[in-house]
Amino acid sequence: LFKSWFVDFDPVRAKQEGRAPEGMDEATAALFPDSFDESELGLVPKGWGVVRLDSFVELAYGKALKAENRKAGPVPVYGSGGITGWHDHAFIEQASIVVGRKGTVGSLYWESRPFFPIDTVFYVKSRKPLTYCHCLLKTLGLDTMNTDAAVPGLNRENVYRLLVTEPPERILAAFDSVVSVLRSSMDQNERQAETLATLRDTLLPRLISGQLRLPEAEVP
């Protein structure tokens, strides 16, 4: 959906050709223009702006948390490679996007729970829907923006200078209303997978060692 609306501009092209945009109702289709303007990024839908990424996105620094200082708890701890452990309290309480800063440069992780991003990552603060920002960041090639040969690193000032289109708020709201439902379903599936993985990691060693035995099947 993101690629169709914000990269290929399919609804705009359809209206320009006199066709009804596919996969949307009339009210949503009416939000899109039927022509393009020239811009620094090439053709963009008429009335859409072109802005620097930092006009609506902030990459905030995570906080140092050594492994020996972590206390067992339900809060995921994020490094640039993803979840590196768990802690008993969060640094960030609301949903956000984790961006790899050192190590795995430009890695992206969505997290809807309270979490703890450590100092090898950024976390996103945004003035636009987080669902939109997550999809947008995936298209910007952050993983190719390494600025340090010795220790791979992402310079946020280089990210901030990137130019992106700025769709109207009503279109972003329409996009978010669709994608947030899908995102919620994905979050639930991920939580279930984590629960099953925890059960596996807890029970399998006990089964292998003989500490836990399955009931023998009854033979009639």
Where are these regions (language model features)?
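Extended, domain-scale alpha-helical bundle/helix-rich regions
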Residues: L1-S4, D8-V12, G18-R19
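Non-catalytic DNA-recognition/assembly elements of restriction-modification systems
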Residues: L1-S4, E26-G79, E169-P215
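Alpha-helix initiation and N-capping motif
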Residues: F9, V50, L130, R156, ...
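Charged, glycine/proline-rich intrinsically disordered loops and linkers
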Residues: A14-F32
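Charge-rich amphipathic alpha-helical interaction elements
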Residues: A60, T165-P167, P220
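A short beta-sheet element
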Residues: G79-L162
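A glycine-rich, aromatic-flanked flexible loop/lid motif
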Residues: W110-E111, T165-I171
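Short, hydrophobic secondary-structure boundary micro-motifs
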Residues: N146, P215-E216
